[in-house]
């Protein structure tokens, strides 16, 4: 979403599409399966999502509704390559997911989110919608704890995880769809938040109109 925003800033009359296709079942350990490998892949599902967005001038002409993308931020955390990813070899793709993952989230994410919001004169308390990637129960819990969020902030995230599992990058777009279906009031700021291999985080600031 951040890159979509970057493109449309330079093309205010343009239309752009973002497509995510995730085949997480490719990591299913058919050769020398392990308990950790089976448990890890059981958290994931195959999925796809697409977003069509327009530049500012086109949106104004169309009278478009929904969220505006205000800003984005990407962070890559040092010495965290082992936290999440894949090992690719002759037996296929092997999922890598360290038990340290929630601790890494707790260590880094709060400063990133609060600093990003502060740059726009905002705090976590005024964010009306949290569109958070369902990276797993422990990670969702860690995000909520480190940001001191109320239980209802991640209602759609928990629902998505329970209904379709973790669809990798497509998941946060599915949660965006559900948020758009029952939008917050006009003028409400919202934050899209995802974590992934690297290990890193992606933040996208939205505002409904």
Regions found by a protein language model. Give the residues of each.
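Claisen-condensing/thiolase-fold acyl-transfer catalytic domains that form or cleave C-C bonds
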Residues: 1-9, 106, 110, 128-209
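Secondary-structure boundary elements
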Residues: 6-14, 54-65, 121
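Short coil/turn connectors at secondary-structure junctions
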Residues: 10-16, 38-39, 47-48, 64-66, ...
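Short beta-strand segments
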Residues: 15-22, 53, 192-196
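Active-site-adjacent elements of ketosynthase-type condensing enzymes
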Residues: 18-39, 71-89, 136-145, 166-174
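Condensing-enzyme catalytic core mediating Claisen C-C bond formation in acyl metabolism
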Residues: 30-107, 111, 115, 195, ...
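Membrane-interfacial loop- and helix-cap regions that link adjacent transmembrane helices
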Residues: 89, 118-119, 126, 146-150
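Stable alpha-helical structural segments in soluble proteins, enriched in small hydrophobic residues
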Residues: 112-120, 171
């Amino acid at each position: 979403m951040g890159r979509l925003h970057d493109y449309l800033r330079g093309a205010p009359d343009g239309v752009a599409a973002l497509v995510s296709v995730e085949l997480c079942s490719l990591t299913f350990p058919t050769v020398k399966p392990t308990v950790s490998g089976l448990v890890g892949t059981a958290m994931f599902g195959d999925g796809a999502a697409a977003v069509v967005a327009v530049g500012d001038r086109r949106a104004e002409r169309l009278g478009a509704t929904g969220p505006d993308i205000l800003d984005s931020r990407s962070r890559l955390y040092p010495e965290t390559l082992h936290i999440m990813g894949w090992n690719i070899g002759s037996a296929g793709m092997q999922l890598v997911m360290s038990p340290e993952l929630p601790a890494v989230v707790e260590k880094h994410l709060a400063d990133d989110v609060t600093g990003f919001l502060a740059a726009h004169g905002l705090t976590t308390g005024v964010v009306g919608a949290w569109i958070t990637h369902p990276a797993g129960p422990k990670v969702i819990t860690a995000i909520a704890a480190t940001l001191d969020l109320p239980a209802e902030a991640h209602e759609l995230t928990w629902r998505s995880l329970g209904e379709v599992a973790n669809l990798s990058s497509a998941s946060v777009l599915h949660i965006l769809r559900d948020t758009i279906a029952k939008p917050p009031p006009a003028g409400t700021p919202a934050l899209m938040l995802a974590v992934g291999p690297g290990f890193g985080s992606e933040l996208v600031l939205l505002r409904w109109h």
